[in-house]
């Protein structure tokens, strides 16, 4: 089979990717500027035209020579036997690229080339081929470089990057071939080797990245989508070979279980994306949804790849740059919090936006989207990903103070803090409490709980309702931080935050970080260690302070069984009154914390029992009897250490019966839970003397939340 030299052009920056792509097609090539060169057959060149996602033009190299003036140019073009390449009845057009030392006018070069070709045909055949700039049979390309002229015959009449599916596009369209390049560079081909590949584009625009990813996943040859594709009409063209290769490509498509999802905040753009997806025939693989990137959630079973090409700063955002930077800041937060183990690639020309992600790049590569120079930034979301030049505290302060400038609705929150503090002051003075709840979602738009721990604040955000704009909810949360700092004169570093919501993946059952900072607080005559940053809760439930006192008073100089004991705060209060205590909990961490609480209060922990066990299983085998039992189970638990899932409404009858089996006949069981819709079992009410003591156990600072817990005193009849 006859061999030729071919040059395959591409966008600057993706030459190595194109070289690798040709290797996968079985073609060895050499990297050149804006393309690659290879020796091969027409069949090899056809394969590139059909299968390449990255190529722009496949060109047969005709000749190269040094040219210093217009006569040299005419003679050089005339020296090529054009009748070996195409017939006189075939049309052609000429395109010029590059720069020449001696020719400033490319139209002049094009005219001289046309004259030389036409004159040659006329001199030999007495006929001349016609020029057709719209739909030619052949395209002749001259590339000028210094004093050299390179002549090529293009196999594809129009650029290969045009796939014909993009009927609708946004303001800043991404070339199809560049979208394919960043996908390959980001690792999509490796991702496709997984059992279920996952790709997300959280700012998908008209869907180009999504569609290119789907084409690769389904092994769809790009040329099959180009309804206007035209191969050259040269004497070297083999129509039968071309048709056979196209048929093989059609039969090579496959079914994929890849998950490819796109999100965008603009419904109009998404409508265009959806139509493009249908046009490309990949609607079975690609889904799109209207969503702000700052609300991005990981709802997938395994790690995947995020690839996106966001708007380019000033070019699209103009005077809304602050909004763009805030978007990237929120995007960085979502990646750090919810996408552990994922890989991320962001193509942008706006470096300031990348800084807002606050993530370390693993790789940077320069690409060109037309004339726009862009950078592909790649990240791996792991323990090393967080960028250190801005601490989390510094970031929180910056966002809090910026949020305070966006609206003044936080003034109402500040006024409520002042009002509540004024109302509680007499009670605080009387009791001496330094830990209390100051605010509990008193204003619906500020759905937070503010707990004061002396000079520290534990701020819990209740997860916003699905109908609430998540960005507004986030803004209000940071406004709350700002007002707590300003109104209560609390240092920013002493404001500790927590969001109550479902945890996933790496977030579950793990300490928040490695700070391991404990603080000492006072409650009545006891001291306790609390930790604001490392665990889901602080180590003490403030709403239980009264029932802890009831338990301690009842257990004075007696025996106490503390079930689901957590950090053993009730046990400490009882021990200070002379009780011998047994604390049972599944968590060794919390039991050790409890022992430290005993030591903090100068109580010999060795004289008390600390048992790590599933309380239900332990109660079933326990033979000891106790004077007082404190039973304070969680509303729901599915810990791996438990034999079964605990549901307090379903299981409280079993729990109470088992606990009563360990209670002396004249003893007292204090039962508490925080399930707001709790209903006591009629069988328990019938079997034992049960008294609801909610009102007795409700402290002054929790009066606005009267259903915060259910408390019962239970005795034998």
Curated annotation (Swiss-Prot):
The gene is rlmL. It catalyses: guanosine(2445) in 23S rRNA + S-adenosyl-L-methionine = N(2)-methylguanosine(2445) in 23S rRNA + S-adenosyl-L-homocysteine + H(+); guanosine(2069) in 23S rRNA + S-adenosyl-L-methionine = N(2)-methylguanosine(2069) in 23S rRNA + S-adenosyl-L-homocysteine + H(+). Its EC number is 2.1.1.173, 2.1.1.264. NCBIfam families: PRK11783.1. Belongs to the methyltransferase superfamily. RlmKL family. The keyword Methyltransferase applies. Specifically methylates the guanine in position 2445 (m2G2445) and the guanine in position 2069 (m7G2069) of 23S rRNA. Keywords: Cytoplasm, Methyltransferase, RNA-binding, rRNA processing, S-adenosyl-L-methionine, Transferase. This is Ribosomal RNA large subunit methyltransferase K/L. The keyword S-adenosyl-L-methionine applies. Residues 44-155 form the THUMP domain. GO terms for molecular function: 23S rRNA (guanine(2445)-N(2))-methyltransferase activity; RNA binding; rRNA (guanine-N7-)-methyltransferase activity. GO terms for cellular component: cytoplasm. It comes from the Bacteria. It comes from Francisella tularensis subsp. mediasiatica (strain FSC147). Gene3D superfamilies: 3.30.2130.30, RNA methyltransferase domain (HRMD) like, Vaccinia Virus protein VP39. SMART domains: THUMP. Pfam families: Methyltrans_SAM (PF10672), RlmL_1st (PF22020), THUMP (PF02926), UPF0020 (PF01170). It is found in: Cytoplasm. Signal peptide: none annotated.
